[in-house]
Amino acid sequence: MLEAYRKHVAERAAEGVVPRPLNAEQVAGLVELLKNPPQGEEEFILDLLENRIPPGVNEAAYVKAGFLTAVTKGEVESPVVSRAKAAELLGTMQGGYNIESLVSLLDDAELAPIAVKALSHTLLMFDAFYDVEEKAQAGNASAQQVLQSWADAEWFTAKDKVAEKITVKVFKVTGETNTDDLSPAPDAWSRPDIPVHAKAMLKMEREGITPDEQGSVGPIKQIEELQKDGIPLAYVGDVVGTGSSRKSATNSVLWFMGEDIPYVPNKRTGGVCLGGKIAPIFYNTMEDSGALPIELNVQDMNMGDVIDIFPYEGVVRKDGAEISSFELGKVLLDEVRAGGRIPLIIGRGLTSRARTSLGLEETDLFAKPIDPSASDKGYTLAQKMVGKACGVEGVRAGQYCEPKMTTVGSQDTTGPMTRDELKDLACLGFSADLVMQSFCHTSAYPKPVDVNTHHTLPDFIMNRAGVSLRPGDGVIHSWLNRMLLPDTVGTGGDSHTRFPLGISFPAGSGLVAFAAATGVMPLDMPESILVRFKGEMQPGITLRDLVHAIPYYGIKQGLLTVEKAGKINEFSGRVLEIEGVEHLSVEQAFELSDASAERSAAGCTVKLSQESIEEYLNSNITMLKWMIAEGYGDVRTIERRIKAMQEWLANPELLTADSDAEYAHVIEIDLAEIDQPILCAPNDPDDARLLSDVQGTEIQEVFIGSCMTNIGHFRAAGKMLEEFNGSLNTRLWVAPPTKMDKDQLTEEGYYGIFGRAGVRIETPGCSLCMGNQARVADKSTVMSTSTRNFPNRLGNGANVYLASAELSAVGAILGRIPTKEEYLEFAQKIDATAADTYRYLNFHKMGQYTEKADTVIFQEPA
């Protein structure tokens, strides 16, 4: 075992990274060595046991806990690990497989004091709390000590307060840093391996940043040079963390700028991030990881500056002179002290339970968020939805709450990290009502590591009562949306988890794991911006044009700027609430809610008609029954969701915003004013332009796909290509969002049309959108229906215009962005058959689905 391990250490050292944590097989070998250690290796193998095995309910932790428990019981002997040492090491494992053993040691006269100390600082107790409480009530003095320690929050007070002054050196990245810069999509395969993945951070050259190897390895030498004097680095940028909800982006920053977590291999906490604007999901993920994120003016901070941050005073000084000021939320410094927002929440809950058990009043030890001032105004739709999930009428902007998570989504490039986080949380079963896992980002062109994920992650999810899709099924959102319940709240490990029914607050994998495991999520209720559409859509104008009208009108009203220095984005961190499109189908509404991600909004609501929602739920009940017939699981979870949908349909009620609800801003968009398509220019989804401003630009590649598309878009493109009846000079990629779309398009003959036109047809899923597998040619100019067009996302040096499927199809045919007149000529023909083109997948009216759905008999009768 040691020989193989040392070989692995040498191989990793050659790559410039630390070794992987030990797996279960290696720990089993280590256990045998610990029983009979080779001479001279005692210290080394003890260090492996202590520091190189992941905590929680990891398979390796199971073997470790089993060995240590056996030693404490005297069933196994080791010259290296005494009974006392074994008990001490059980106390470093955070939770999960060590808990039962530690609780039982409270009855062991010799080891009880060690168990008391260990349990006093263990937060992941869950139902084992009652075992300790029971012992305490039965007179066990050690258990009473533990209960009192929890009540006194010694797990928190034993940690150092955040320092009055924090000295850091500036690592300045000018302009916008998106999560693709910090965690590049082509390197998604390595995300769970934090030290390896971190090497790709900022691997593309940009102002002030010099990668070790352009396109492969980031500025590690530059970082190491700055760190030579021992002053910790702080990540500083004008705009930081926009884009995808990748916890891997935070992991990479903290790998270079954070600090080790005792007894936890290859993971770091702490660190400081300063940004003129910090995207809300990234900010939350930093909070969860124990970092200190601060929004403030960074224009007087330059690469290599040594600055002093005074967190309690709210100022930053350089050479004694004040260069910036800020205001922190009251709870943030408690979060940093506790090692993150999630440990703080779990710890506060544990302290509260202990105090209740002991008959003590609520503690005043923790900082409390400031409650917003009382208001006699009404609530917005989002405030009512979150209120319902908290058991109250509504939640005011600025109010802290923990809404119930009805639906949680996970996809395959964040899923392996979410799995690790769930293990760290000692989660063996989900508390959220429905948790769904997809395989949409990696199924088309999987690497061996992806294939392993495809084989292992479904069982992990279903064993915890989650629902697992299969590789090739399609995009997470196109499936998850069909599992939603009206007016409920959820989250997902993908920034485009933007429910068209209810509301969702997407998050990084750590917070998603917490939501899935506990069934709730921490939330500081954001303010809302109302977007109200009025009037009639003009001929040729699509929903994608309405999507782009929001930033276009935002720019016109001074609520949004494209310039990154001193960036204005009033949408950032707020909820987008959309009205005036009640007639849309839920599939169509998702196009609007989905794109709230590009605004860096915290969430989105869309006011829809009861008729649209009823049709959607009837369709989805059939789809979910069909899934059971097709062998999907967890069956009980799917059945429970079907019954909840049926209950809503039996008594349909929808929340509505109050007429006197308060909004941070109101944007009114007259559809009569939008008489030509609106695109987003390279390479910024905020840079909304009219078609006439960009017409004539030559196009080499076109992509029609992503969660922003539905079956109607592919019919529209197919009809244009059939009318064209020639060979394209552009490269056109087509990727339907689900296998159901693919099957229906095939049945209707559209795949034949695509084939004759030379279209590259992709597996249902994300395809080019994330850029983690297939990519467009370097430096090509592209029209795309994808979600965002950040630099290098779809291809290295590519210039990407975001546009509707209809406009993109015209671009593919012409080889350039058309004029308004050219486009409308094509669009007129599509409008003539709109009723046929824009039919959606109503499964309850499709025989191939109803026939199978009708065979399903529920395991548990209603």
PLM region spans:
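Alpha-solenoid helical repeat architecture
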Residues: 34-38, 71-78, 90, 103-110, ...
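Generic amphipathic, hydrophobic interface segment in small proteins and small subunits
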Residues: 31-48
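Fe-S-dependent hydro-lyases/dehydratases of central metabolism
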Residues: 92, 98, 105-107, 113-862
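Buried hydrophobic core positions in alpha-solenoid tandem helical repeats
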Residues: 30, 45, 63-72, 99-103, ...
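Structural detector for internal amphipathic alpha-helices that build alpha-solenoid repeat scaffolds
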Residues: 15-21, 43-59, 73, 80-95, ...
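Short amphipathic alpha-helical segments that mediate assembly, nucleic-acid/protein binding
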Residues: 5, 27, 41-42, 64, ...
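Amphipathic alpha-helical packing elements
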Residues: 2-31, 36, 332-336, 341-346
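Helix-turn-helix repeat elements of alpha-solenoid scaffolds
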Residues: 24-25, 58-64
